[in-house]
Design a protein with these regions (language model features):
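Non-catalytic interaction-recognition regions
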Residues: 1-444
C-alpha cells in the first residue's frame, strides 16, 4: 500500500494535482483492544522494558490474537476495551498512545528506508474522528439511512447480500456501543470533501476490503457527504506470495516483515553489483546495493498489475535482464554515461524533417507517448503502466544505440538528432524512475 500510494502521489503531483497524503495510523479497532487487554493481563510480557521494540509487540499481538480465538471471556474483555478506548478511558488511552508511538517509529523508519514521502504529519487515524462518530451515526439514523438491527445500527442495501441471499449490512455502531470502521470511514469522507475540498479520494487498501468500500461510498452518497462531482475509488492490491504460491511466510508460519524482505533484496543486490563491478569502493558498493535492492522490491510491486498476486523472488527482482528495476537502473546509467561524452550545447529536440532510421523513429515515437502514459497512470491508478512504458523505452534505446552511430553519425543534422534522442531518453528514464520512487544512481 505504501509503495503503490507513494508512486501515485508522485505521478499526480507531477501532473499538477494538489495531493494530500493521509496515512491511516492510529487505528483503535478490535486489534488494539486485543493487544491492550493482553498487555494489561500479561505484566511479564516486557514490551516496555524492550524500549518499544516493535518485534516484541508483534510477538504480543500474535499471542493476543491466538488467545482471542480460543478464549471467549478474553475476547469479550478485548471488545469492551475498544469501547472504553472510544469513550476516552484515561488508562486505556495512555496504553494506546504508547503503542501508537512505537508503531509510528517503526513505520517511519521503513518509510525513510523506502524513500516514500510519508511523514508523521501525514498520519490521520481513526482517533482523530472519534469526537464526531456519534454525530455521524445520529445523522444517518435521522435521515432514515441507518436503522437499528439486533442492537446495532446498520445500513442495508438492496443489491448487497450474502451467499444465502441474507442481507449484508454496513455496521456503523456495534451492539456493544462501539463504533465500527464504517463510521470512521464515513466521517473521513465528510471531512475530506467538506473541509479539505477533495475532488478525488483514492483508498490504497487490500483487495479484500472491496465490499466494505462499496458500501461506505454508497452510504456517503445517500447521506450527501459524497456528491457526484467527487470521485471516491478503492485502489486494491494483491498479495506477495512465497515459492509455494501461498502468502509469504517464514518457516514457523509468521508473516515476513517488510524490513526482512528489504534486507534480503539489498544483500542479493550487493552480490550482483559487486560481481559486475568488482573494483567498486566499499562505500560506493553499499550505496549502490541499497539503491538497487530497495528499487528492486519497489519495482517488483509496481510493475505487476496491482490486483494480481505475485511471488517474492529476490533473484528475479535483482536480475539484470527482463522487466526489473535493476535493468532500468543500468539502462539509465548507460544512457547518462553516453550523455557525458556528448559535446556541450548538444541539441535537445529532434528535427523530424530529417530522414530517420527506423530505430530512431521508433524511439522518438515512444518518447512522445510519455505524457499520455502518465495521464493513463493518473486516471487508472495503475503504476504498472509506467513500468511497462519505461521497460519498452530501455529496449528501444538499446536497439537504437546498437544500430545508429551517435558521435560518428554521417551528417551534423543526424548527429544532433541522435544526441537529442539520447538526452530525451536519459531525462525520461530518470523522471520515470523518480516518479516510481526508484533511485536512479549513475554511475552504477
Amino acid at each position: 500500500t505504501t509503495i503503490i500510494g507513494g508512486a501515485l502521489v508522485r505521478v499526480l503531483g507531477h501532473l499538477g494535482a494538489d495531493v494530500v497524503r493521509q496515512n491511516h495510523l492510529g487505528d483503535w479497532g478490535t486489534q488494539f483492544g486485543m493487544l491492550t487487554q493482553y498487555l494489561d493481563e500479561s505484566p511479564d510480557a516486557g514490551w516496555r522494558a524492550a524500549a518499544g521494540d516493535i518485534s516484541m509487540l508483534n510477538a504480543c499481538y500474535r499471542a493476543a490474537t491466538a488467545r482471542f480465538g480460543v478464549d471467549q471471556a478474553f475476547a469479550d474483555r478485548a471488545r469492551r476495551r475498544v469501547v472504553s478506548l472510544q469513550a476516552g478511558d484515561p488508562a486505556t488511552l495512555a496504553t494506546w498512545r504508547d503503542l501508537v508511538a512505537v508503531s509510528q517509529r517503526a513505520f517511519q523508519a521503513l518509510y525513510d528506508r523506502l524513500g516514500v514521502l510519508l511523514t508523521p504529519a501525514d498520519a490521520d487515524g481513526e482517533s482523530g474522528y472519534n469526537g464526531v462518530l456519534a454525530e455521524v451515526v445520529d445523522a444517518l439514523v435521522a435521515a432514515g439511512i441507518a436503522v437499528e438491527s439486533s442492537g446495532a445500527v446498520c445500513v442495508f442495501f438492496d443489491d448487497v447480500a450474502g451467499p444465502g441471499r441474507e442481507p449484508v449490512p454496513l455496521i456503523v455502531r456495534k451492539s456493544d456501543g462501539g463504533f465500527g470502521y464504517a463510521a470512521t470511514d464515513l466521517a473521513t469522507i465528510r471531512h475530506r470533501v467538506s473541509t479539505l475540498g477533495a475532488d478525488r479520494i483514492l483508498y490504497v487498501v487490500d483487495a479484500r476490503q472491496a465490499m466494505h468500500f462499496r458500501m461506505v461510498f454508497a452510504t456517503a452518497r445517500r447521506a450527501g457527504w459524497l456528491p457526484e462531482r467527487v470521485e471516491a475509488a478503492h485502489v486494491p492490491f494483491g498479495t506477495v506470495l512465497g515459492a509455494d504460491g501461498r502468502p509469504f511466510r517464514t518457516r514457523d508460519g509468521d508473516t515476513v516483515s517488510l524490513g526482512g524482505l528489504l534486507d534480503a533484496a539489498v544483500d542479493r543486490a550487493r552480490t550482483v553489483v559487486g560481481g559486475k563491478n568488482p573494483d567498486l569502493a566499499e562505500a560506493d558498493l553499499a550505496r549502490v546495493a541499497h539503491a538497487v535492492g530497495i528499487g528492486a522490491v519497489k519495482y517488483a510491486e509496481l510493475s505487476t498489475s496491482r490486483t494480481r498476486d505475485y511471488p517474492f523472488d529476490v533473484d528475479r527482482m535483482v536480475s539484470l535482464s527482463g522487466n526489473t528495476g535493476v535493468y532500468l537502473q543500468y539502462a539509465n546509467a548507460r544512457v547518462h554515461s553516453i550523455l557525458e561524452r556528448l559535446p556541450a550545447g548538444t541539441e535537445r529536440t529532434v528535427d523530424t524533417g530529417l530522414p530517420l532510421h527506423p530505430a530512431e523513429r521508433a524511439l522518438a515515437l515512444h518518447l512522445d507517448e510519455f505524457g499520455a502514459v502518465l495521464a493513463e497512470v493518473a486516471a487508472s491508478a495503475e503504476p504498472h503502466r509506467l513500468c511497462g512504458y519505461l521497460f519498452a523505452l530501455a529496449r528501444l534505446f538499446t536497439d537504437f544505440y546498437g544500430t545508429c552511430h551517435v558521435l560518428r553519425a554521417q551528417t551534423a543534422g543526424q548527429r544532433a538528432n541522435r544526441a537529442a534522442l539520447c538526452r530525451l531518453t536519459g531525462n525520461t528514464l530518470s523522471t520515470g524512475l523518480g516518479l516510481l520512487g526508484v533511485q536512479a544512481p549513475h554511475p552504477l
